[in-house]
């Protein structure tokens, strides 16, 4: 029994898996959630980031430098991919899907030619663990959790509170109108794709020390990335975090009692049910809010408030 009573001894792994689900889907939030590109090469950007960390580690012995260079490498390749191939395919979803699928296969084959199919290992930059309230917490897993929280907070702030975020949201919602406002839509799309690719590369580098690295590394995360973004709602960062908590938490808890294969199947079923029920839940929530707003508006003094709201500001007269 742990200090928290009802939690299993290694329940910190629940938090870690939620962070992992959030981290792997955060890059896809840009390429698929915002740009609506069914990016089947998303897993390969994690792969590129992981192998960048491995290569730098082999060349210099400095895995931290490799992790820092991983998003640079993945982001650069993301720009090249967007400018060279996807630029003309935004209105052709099937063609973009086939293009990203082909690039994913090519990337895996190139990695296998360069590094073989033999498993590789990226060192844990910190090593060791510590105990908190009876939990054995590996330092590197704590780093993953902290990095995920920081990335989500940073992305949320950038998209909600900066000029870049305003332009990005305008580009995503109405590209034609954004162009009339002087926004370079092509450049914004390239920037968003590069950011998504860079975050995926960083995710791959951060996750490499706790996984075996081989050319199939990216495929481990591809399906769950799409599940999180789809269940959370395309373009919704808050929904992404909630979906990651539901799916990652469910998978981690189920693995305590059943095999990983059956746990993943149940998570898939949860995702399907979530997508199916989400419109119904959204409609009921909207209806509840409308009734609550109406009830508040019909309270004492509501007529006076309504007249006050309709009255012209002080010093102004309607013609």
Predicted regions and their residues:
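Short, non-helical or kinked segments that cap or interrupt transmembrane helices
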Residues: 28-50, 91-96, 164-167, 185, ...
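Inter-helical junctions in multi-pass inner-membrane proteins, predominant
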Residues: 2-14, 155-163, 190-232, 251-264
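Single transmembrane alpha-helix segments in multi-pass membrane proteins
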Residues: 6-56, 80-95, 231-234
């Amino acid at each position: 029994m742990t200090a928290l009573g009802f939690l299993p001894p290694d329940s910190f792994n629940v938090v870690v898996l939620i962070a992992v689900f959030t981290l792997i889907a955060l890059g896809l939030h840009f390429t698929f959630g915002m740009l609506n590109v069914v990016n089947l090469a998303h897993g390969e950007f994690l792969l590129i980031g992981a192998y960048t960390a491995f290569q730098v580690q082999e060349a210099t012995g400095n895995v931290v430098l490799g992790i820092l260079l991983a998003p640079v490498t993945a982001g650069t390749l993301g720009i090249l991919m967007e400018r060279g191939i996807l630029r003309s395919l935004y209105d052709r979803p099937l063609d973009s899907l086939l293009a990203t699928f082909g690039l994913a296969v090519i990337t895996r084959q190139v990695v296998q030619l360069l590094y073989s199919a033999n498993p590789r290992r990226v060192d844990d930059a910190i090593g060791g663990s510590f105990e908190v309230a009876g939990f054995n917490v590996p330092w590197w897993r704590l780093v993953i959790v902290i990095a995920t929280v920081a990335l989500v907070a940073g992305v949320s702030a950038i998209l909600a509170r900066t000029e870049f975020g305003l332009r990005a949201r305008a580009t995503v919602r109405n590209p034609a109108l954004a162009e009339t406002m002087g926004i370079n839509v092509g450049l914004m799309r390239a920037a968003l794709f590069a950011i998504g690719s860079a975050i995926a590369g960083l995710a791959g580098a951060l996750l490499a020390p706790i996984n075996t690295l081989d050319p199939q590394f990216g495929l481990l995360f591809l399906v769950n990335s799409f599940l999180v973004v789809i269940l959370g709602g395309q373009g919704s960062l808050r929904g992404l975090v909630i979906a990651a908590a539901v799916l990652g938490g469910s998978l981690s808890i189920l693995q305590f009692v059943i095999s990983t294969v059956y746990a993943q199947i149940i998570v898939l079923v949860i995702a399907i049910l979530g997508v199916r029920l989400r419109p119904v839940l959204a409609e009921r929530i909207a209806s509840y809010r409308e009734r609550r707003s109406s009830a508040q508006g019909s309270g004492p003094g509501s007529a006076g408030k309504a007249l006050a709201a309709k009255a012209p500001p002080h010093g102004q007269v309607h013609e």
